[in-house]
Amino acid sequence: MSGAARTLVLFPDAHGIARGKLVNRDCTRAVRVGFSSGVFSKDVYGHPVLFPVLAKPFGAADIKVDVTDHDGRELEGFATGLLGASAIAIGAVTDPRGDPHPLDFRAHLGNLLERTTGLCETRIGAELEFYLIGDDDRVHLAPDGQAYAFGGIGLRQRCLSDMLDALDGAGIVWRDLSQENEHDQYEIALAHTDPLEQADRIFLARMICRTVAASHGLRCTFIAVEHKDRSPSNLHLHVSARFDGSDMNASSKRIASGMRHVLDEAFLTLSPTRNSRHAQNIASFRSGASDISDGGRFSALRRLEEDGTPRVELRTPTSDANPYLAILLVLAGMNTAAASDAFPEPRPLDFDFANSITAFEESRLARAALPDETVSLYASMKRHEAQKAAEFATFEAERGALLKVL
């Protein structure tokens, strides 16, 4: 690209999908960018189901995305040419009334961190699983679907290398890349960092990986169930809290108790689409219950230790989860939990989509973390989305709609 200073101004919609504009200026000064208010009214398939509530009363007047001079991320190397920008910035959204937008979950996560002592010291790592899809006359050269079959990456090496180069150029620190349980299923593990930064990295990494894949004639998808006969893709979250060395068990127990609250009350935030519910019927390294183990991969929660620091892995979120909303609810759960809490007997997870929507709407945890208006709007959107999902005649038809956005 030219040497012109251009900033890609982004914001996450209600589903954690990147929306934005390329602005012809640098990111050293504050900027406000207008967008149609209808963007937050859309379900995951793109239907404006909340348009009468969020856009029509205001004549579809603009929402505004505000970026401060501290929000910019300078881009380097491959990322600059890929995105056509010298910097990237994620802004805060105000609705047409000038108020913080109720479905800006990034802002809600930031607010929780600001008002809650100690949560900022939490560190979160993430593992992003995804599929690459494309026509390839060399498919006969691919190995069978075995985890860590690194020889299989050779067919996609240029695309995957460009993904990693772009992540480097955007300042997104990754730890490792591996093949997952299926041919053309991969995982990128992101380094531990603070909660808001990690949510931003997940958000940006998804957009970057999809953009890179498209430049190679491939589709990178983070939908949860790409095929009913193939392993689902997940978003594993590794959470560690401040630990002074006095009681390692108490630290991990508080994290796990908080996660258990989310599984019981706000499973919708971890498995947010009807497509993601098909994972219940696929044998994979995940659990259908709210169980916990010491290192075991077949449980929903997995207690681990790294460099003397206890952490807990939440293995349940599917790859389509909104990172801001999922991390927000995990932190809210930790905030309400205590190390002295008794960990209850495991219960089966309720994969019924309608039940999850009702549970979220009635959740004390969700209403402690989010304004009532936000909870009601999100539940309403998901109910409309469930109705739209039922209109797809086949799994493949719904999958096709999701591939366009996730």
Residue ranges and their predicted role:
Residues 10, 92, 129-131, 189-191, ...:
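Residue-level recognition of well-ordered beta-strand positions that form the cores
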Residues 81-84, 179-182, 303-309:
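Short, ordered beta-strand-loop transition motifs
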Residues 6, 18, 86-90, 125-129, ...:
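Broad gene-expression machinery/nucleic-acid interaction feature
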